[in-house]
Protein backbone atom coordinates (compact mmCIF):
# COMPACT_ATOMS: atom_id res chain seq x y z
CA UNK A 1 0.00 0.00 0.00
CA UNK A 2 1.28 3.47 -0.87
CA UNK A 3 0.13 6.71 0.73
CA UNK A 4 1.03 9.95 -1.02
CA UNK A 5 1.31 13.01 1.21
CA UNK A 6 1.20 16.14 -0.93
CA UNK A 7 2.00 19.59 0.40
CA UNK A 8 3.68 22.83 -0.50
CA UNK A 9 7.44 23.25 -0.53
CA UNK A 10 7.95 23.91 3.17
CA UNK A 11 11.56 22.78 3.41
CA UNK A 12 12.88 19.80 5.34
CA UNK A 13 11.54 20.83 8.71
CA UNK A 14 8.12 21.89 7.45
CA UNK A 15 7.37 19.41 4.73
CA UNK A 16 9.40 16.25 5.10
CA UNK A 17 9.17 16.29 8.88
CA UNK A 18 5.40 16.57 8.69
CA UNK A 19 5.21 13.54 6.42
CA UNK A 20 7.60 11.59 8.66
CA UNK A 21 5.43 12.42 11.66
CA UNK A 22 2.30 11.25 9.82
CA UNK A 23 4.01 8.02 8.74
CA UNK A 24 4.96 7.27 12.34
CA UNK A 25 1.33 7.67 13.41
CA UNK A 26 0.06 5.06 10.94
CA UNK A 27 -0.04 1.35 11.70
CA UNK A 28 2.05 -0.94 9.51
CA UNK A 29 4.15 1.66 7.67
CA UNK A 30 7.56 0.08 7.09
CA UNK A 31 9.37 2.65 4.93
CA UNK A 32 9.03 6.32 4.22
CA UNK A 33 10.11 7.82 0.89
CA UNK A 34 11.11 11.46 0.74
CA UNK A 35 11.14 13.05 -2.71
CA UNK A 36 11.48 16.66 -3.81
CA UNK A 37 8.35 18.12 -5.34
CA UNK A 38 10.23 19.23 -8.46
CA UNK A 39 11.86 15.84 -9.11
CA UNK A 40 10.83 13.80 -12.16
CA UNK A 41 10.55 10.07 -11.58
CA UNK A 42 10.00 7.05 -13.81
CA UNK A 43 7.38 4.77 -12.23
CA UNK A 44 9.75 1.81 -12.67
CA UNK A 45 11.99 3.37 -10.03
CA UNK A 46 9.27 2.80 -7.44
CA UNK A 47 8.97 -0.82 -8.54
CA UNK A 48 12.75 -1.23 -8.19
CA UNK A 49 12.64 0.37 -4.76
CA UNK A 50 9.85 -1.92 -3.53
CA UNK A 51 11.81 -4.96 -4.76
CA UNK A 52 14.96 -3.79 -3.03
CA UNK A 53 13.14 -3.02 0.21
CA UNK A 54 11.79 -6.56 0.27
CA UNK A 55 15.42 -7.66 0.77
CA UNK A 56 16.73 -4.90 3.05
CA UNK A 57 13.68 -4.58 5.31
CA UNK A 58 14.17 -1.91 7.94
CA UNK A 59 17.95 -2.11 8.09
CA UNK A 60 19.14 0.38 5.46
CA UNK A 61 18.37 3.81 4.07
CA UNK A 62 18.07 3.58 0.28
CA UNK A 63 19.12 6.72 -1.52
CA UNK A 64 18.35 7.58 -5.09
CA UNK A 65 20.81 9.09 -7.52
CA UNK A 66 20.10 12.49 -9.01
CA UNK A 67 20.25 12.73 -12.79
CA UNK A 68 20.45 16.11 -14.50
CA UNK A 69 17.07 16.98 -15.98
CA UNK A 70 18.66 19.27 -18.57
CA UNK A 71 21.22 16.60 -19.55
CA UNK A 72 19.30 13.37 -18.83
CA UNK A 73 22.28 11.07 -19.39
CA UNK A 74 24.40 12.85 -16.75
CA UNK A 75 24.56 11.63 -13.17
CA UNK A 76 24.75 14.67 -10.96
CA UNK A 77 25.30 12.91 -7.64
CA UNK A 78 25.12 9.44 -6.10
CA UNK A 79 25.31 10.12 -2.38
CA UNK A 80 28.11 11.71 -0.38
CA UNK A 81 30.72 10.84 2.20
CA UNK A 82 31.87 12.88 5.19
CA UNK A 83 35.39 14.25 4.96
CA UNK A 84 37.17 15.56 8.08
CA UNK A 85 33.85 15.65 9.97
CA UNK A 86 33.06 19.08 8.51
CA UNK A 87 32.69 18.61 4.76
CA UNK A 88 30.76 16.33 2.48
CA UNK A 89 32.17 14.98 -0.76
CA UNK A 90 29.76 14.15 -3.56
CA UNK A 91 30.20 10.75 -5.13
CA UNK A 92 30.16 10.30 -8.89
CA UNK A 93 29.47 13.97 -9.59
CA UNK A 94 28.76 15.05 -13.17
CA UNK A 95 29.32 11.65 -14.79
CA UNK A 96 28.31 11.07 -18.41
CA UNK A 97 26.55 7.70 -18.20
CA UNK A 98 26.86 7.14 -21.96
CA UNK A 99 30.53 6.26 -21.43
CA UNK A 100 30.84 2.55 -20.61
CA UNK A 101 33.89 3.13 -18.39
CA UNK A 102 31.84 5.54 -16.28
CA UNK A 103 29.60 2.64 -15.23
CA UNK A 104 32.39 0.50 -13.72
CA UNK A 105 32.18 2.03 -10.19
CA UNK A 106 28.53 0.96 -10.03
CA UNK A 107 29.37 -2.74 -10.34
CA UNK A 108 30.03 -2.96 -6.61
CA UNK A 109 28.11 -2.25 -3.45
CA UNK A 110 28.96 1.16 -2.06
CA UNK A 111 27.74 2.63 1.18
CA UNK A 112 27.52 6.39 1.56
CA UNK A 113 27.36 8.59 4.64
CA UNK A 114 24.43 10.60 3.38
CA UNK A 115 21.92 10.81 0.56
CA UNK A 116 19.96 13.95 -0.19
CA UNK A 117 16.21 13.93 0.12
CA UNK A 118 15.55 14.46 -3.58
CA UNK A 119 14.78 10.72 -3.28
CA UNK A 120 15.49 8.80 -0.12
CA UNK A 121 13.69 5.84 1.50
CA UNK A 122 14.11 5.67 5.26
CA UNK A 123 12.74 2.75 7.30
CA UNK A 124 10.19 4.06 9.80
CA UNK A 125 11.91 2.04 12.53
CA UNK A 126 15.07 4.08 11.90
CA UNK A 127 13.07 7.33 11.97
CA UNK A 128 11.79 6.29 15.41
CA UNK A 129 15.38 5.74 16.59
CA UNK A 130 16.75 8.97 15.12
CA UNK A 131 13.61 10.95 15.97
CA UNK A 132 12.35 13.72 13.73
CA UNK A 133 14.62 16.19 11.93
CA UNK A 134 15.66 19.38 13.69
CA UNK A 135 12.83 21.97 13.78
CA UNK A 136 14.75 24.49 11.70
CA UNK A 137 15.01 25.13 8.00
CA UNK A 138 18.52 25.57 6.70
CA UNK A 139 20.05 24.35 3.51
CA UNK A 140 21.50 20.97 4.31
CA UNK A 141 18.99 19.96 6.99
CA UNK A 142 18.76 16.58 5.25
CA UNK A 143 22.53 16.34 5.56
CA UNK A 144 22.34 16.69 9.35
CA UNK A 145 19.73 13.94 9.51
CA UNK A 146 21.79 11.62 7.33
CA UNK A 147 24.80 12.08 9.57
CA UNK A 148 22.61 11.47 12.62
CA UNK A 149 21.43 8.18 11.13
CA UNK A 150 25.02 7.18 10.41
CA UNK A 151 26.03 7.91 14.01
CA UNK A 152 23.23 5.56 15.12
CA UNK A 153 24.78 2.81 12.99
CA UNK A 154 22.19 3.00 10.20
CA UNK A 155 23.77 2.26 6.82
CA UNK A 156 22.87 4.24 3.72
CA UNK A 157 23.35 2.99 0.19
CA UNK A 158 22.79 4.97 -3.02
CA UNK A 159 21.54 2.42 -5.53
CA UNK A 160 21.95 2.42 -9.31
CA UNK A 161 18.54 1.99 -10.92
CA UNK A 162 16.92 4.18 -8.28
CA UNK A 163 17.10 7.79 -9.43
CA UNK A 164 15.18 10.93 -10.19
CA UNK A 165 15.80 13.73 -12.67
CA UNK A 166 16.03 17.22 -11.32
CA UNK A 167 17.47 20.53 -12.37
CA UNK A 168 21.04 20.70 -11.17
CA UNK A 169 21.78 21.78 -7.65
CA UNK A 170 25.09 22.35 -5.99
CA UNK A 171 26.84 19.09 -5.14
CA UNK A 172 27.06 18.22 -1.45
CA UNK A 173 30.53 19.67 -0.92
CA UNK A 174 29.27 23.13 -1.96
CA UNK A 175 26.47 23.16 0.59
CA UNK A 176 28.87 24.47 3.20
CA UNK A 177 29.85 27.72 1.44
CA UNK A 178 27.31 29.99 3.19
CA UNK A 179 27.02 27.83 6.28
CA UNK A 180 30.78 28.03 6.90
CA UNK A 181 30.29 31.64 7.92
CA UNK A 182 28.08 30.47 10.79
CA UNK A 183 28.73 26.79 11.44
CA UNK A 184 31.88 24.70 11.50
CA UNK A 185 29.94 21.47 10.86
CA UNK A 186 26.38 20.44 10.02
CA UNK A 187 25.86 19.30 13.61
CA UNK A 188 26.56 22.83 14.92
CA UNK A 189 23.13 23.78 13.62
CA UNK A 190 21.69 21.97 16.63
CA UNK A 191 23.78 23.99 19.07
CA UNK A 192 22.20 27.39 18.30
List the predicted regions and their residue ranges.
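Alpha-helical scaffold elements adjacent to nucleotide-binding pockets in ATP/GTP-utilizing enzyme cores
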Residues: 18-19, 44, 48-52, 145, ...
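Short beta-strand-to-loop acidic/aromatic patch adjacent to the donor-nucleotide binding site
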Residues: 27-40
Amino acid sequence: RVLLIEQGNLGGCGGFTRSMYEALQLEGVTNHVLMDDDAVIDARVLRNLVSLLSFTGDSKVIGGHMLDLLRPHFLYEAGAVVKSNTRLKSLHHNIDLRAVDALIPFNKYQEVDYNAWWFCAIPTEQIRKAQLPAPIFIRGDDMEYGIRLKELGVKTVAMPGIAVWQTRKEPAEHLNMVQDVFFSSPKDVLEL
